[in-house]
């Protein structure tokens, strides 16, 4: 079961930059509200799955922060160096969390 939760978490986390692009490309308040609901839904989902079932508090905080870094990276793409740097951090941290999660998946 821990493998299913791990891959779902990574998949959902990977959707944040895509959703940020949608937010940037449309100036609609409905999209803004939807993004806020998705962010809070992600935090609740990550907290329930990772903390309650797996007791991985550090990975939970890292995953939530990584989602925000990717989100902010796409939002800042028009400010040249900051958006690119945030997206590079997002990719490196994402690989690190995936490797660490797979390494310790049996402890979940």
From Swiss-Prot:
Domain of life, source organism: Viruses
* Residue stretches spanning the membrane: 11-31, 33-53, 69-89
Q: Where in the cell is it found?
A: Host membrane
Report the membrane topology from the UniProt record: Multi-pass membrane protein
Q: What is its main location?
A: host cell
Q: Name one GO cellular component term.
A: membrane
The entry's keywords: Host membrane, Membrane, Transmembrane, Transmembrane helix
Report what the protein is called. Answer: Putative transmembrane protein ORF108
